[in-house]
Amino acid sequence: MTTQVPKRLRQPIVVVLGHVDHGKTTLLDKIRGTAVVKKEPGEMTQEVGASFVPTSVIEKISEPLKKSFPIKLEIPGLLFIDTPGHELFSNLRKRGGSVADIAILVVDIVEGIQKQTLESIEILKSRKVPFIVAANKIDRINGWKAQDTYSFLESINKQEQRVRDNLDKQVYNLVIQLAEQGFNAERFDRIRDFTKTVAIIPVSAKTGEGIAEVLAILAGLTQNYMKNKLKFAEGPAKGVILEVKELQGLGYTADVVIYEGILRKNDIIVLAGIDGPIVTKVRAILVPRPLQDIKLAKSDLAQIDEVYAASGVKVYAQNLETALAGSPIYVAENNEEVEKYKKIIQEEVSAVRYYNSSVYGIIVKADSLGSLEAIVSSLERRNIPIRLADIGPISKRDITEAEIVAEKAKEYGIIAAFRVKPLSGIEIPEKIKLISDDIIYQLMDNIEKYIEDIKESEKRKTLETIVLPGKIKIIPGYVFRRSDPVIVGVEVLGGIIRPKYGLIKKDGRRVGEVLQIQDNKKSVDRASKGMEVAVSIKGNIMVGRQVEEGEVLYTDVPKEDLQILMEKYKDIVTDDMIEVIKEIIRIKRTQDATYGLGLQFQ
């Protein structure tokens, strides 16, 4: 097997993203399965990690749409990346964007946009990849009757009016949700300008209804608006590594998507490895042998001499055992190009792998460049600091770095592991939290929850130990005991009082300490603004001498406690508490001119 015929336009590369259980895999399987059914012998080519649906098959499936969407297809077809989800999509990376030309964002039409959908939208935005929305599971809409057609438009015309109204309601909900994310969206058959509006295509991955429109819109959009990007380049290949695998009887191979140019056997290629750029020679280009079923075909590989973009192939070469998934792969025609691409790769990898010893943040370890980049980007959006981000298993160094962080900032003493495990013999100490997951959005959720839990726990502990601002007035006529200890009725005018809080007068003199607080004859651990409670106060104090009925007292807040409150826990400081703080500062400054200096009240 040696040849492929060069094309004027290459096939667009399509990825499928969306929330878990919204039907990504089912939709992809339906598209592939439908294409297999509709093909003629020789029409479908098998690829590694991808499925090519040729134009002839797209035209057959979308035959019912000829009148609605008249378009003469010039692209050779569509290349679908086989594994859905943004974990693998992350590896389809290239400088300034993505290897993917367009995406299908699968959304359950009943459930609408969910957390992982938002994560997918964020990564599509960051990689500047346009997308269409497949509003899946229309068969779940109440009263929907499945029709024997791949066309949504044919099917909707045969539904009862109430079912159509139901569908419109769900589509409208989706339009609103997408608008909240900054996208103007509409049902595809109501769009006038596809450059300004995201197309929503109602579909059932289960019955196949809507598959015709999905393929037709994908083909039409890419052909009409991406011609320059899709122009076939005759030059040396550029690609990206999806996965690195060990093949029995052969050795390490790389599953590669070629998005530009031609890759030939014996080409010199430059790619990223764990320890730096790898320069090696292509020993073999492998593709699955043609079989009826694409999935079955993947186990039986055949060699070809060259491959044109866009294609998914398996590349066998020496020294691939340390190659990084998500790495660019370049064909170099001479030594000068080898050095040029080594430098480019070094810069790209350095931009993703990260270490900053001055940052007390989390440690991130991932299995590929793409997933690491996606996780770092996701953490940055959430304002979670990162100390170290790298590829590969968890090492002793990672533990040491996490321990340093945990000493200073317990909430960030985390090792976040994406599809990697600790090296053999490495144990995670108790003070370090290992958070591991195979789905990015779940990893993010777990990291955020842990940080929040630790912060809340630390906050509770700290607020138990510091003195908070409080202001009370001794209510005239409510003196139950005049001394040793004094027991009086008080009104809390602002802030909070608690047992063990010291009390001061307006002139700054300390009069004693709160022993106990009772509300309706029941002991309570605090009293806040507006409450009238009985308090016992111990110290050198007597009502009528050191304090008077009707007198106002303040909690004795140490300078350090006020600093902690205003710098770390300002969110609990109420308006009435701020007024009390200002009064306490005025009192305290008669004895300490630096008390409360530099505090921000806004």
Curated annotation (Swiss-Prot):
Region (G3): 82-85
CDD domains: aeIF5B_II, IF2_aeIF5B_IV, IF2_eIF5B
SUPFAM superfamilies reported in the protein's UniProt record: Initiation factor IF2/eIF5b, domain 3, P-loop containing nucleoside triphosphate hydrolases, Translation proteins
GO-annotated molecular function: GTP binding; GTPase activity; translation initiation factor activity
Residue span of region G5: 204-206
InterPro entries hit by this protein: EFTU-type, P-loop_NTPase, Small_GTP-bd, T_Tr_GTP-bd_dom, TF_aIF-2_arc, TIF_IF2, TIF_IF2_dom3, TIF_IF2_dom3_sf
Pfam family, one: IF-2
Region (G4): 136-139
PROSITE patterns assigned: G_TR_2
Record-given protein name: Probable translation initiation factor IF-2
Organism: Sulfolobus acidocaldarius (strain ATCC 33909 / DSM 639 / JCM 8929 / NBRC 15157 / NCIMB 11770)
Lineage: Archaea, Thermoproteota, Thermoprotei, Sulfolobales, Sulfolobaceae
This protein's encoding gene: infB
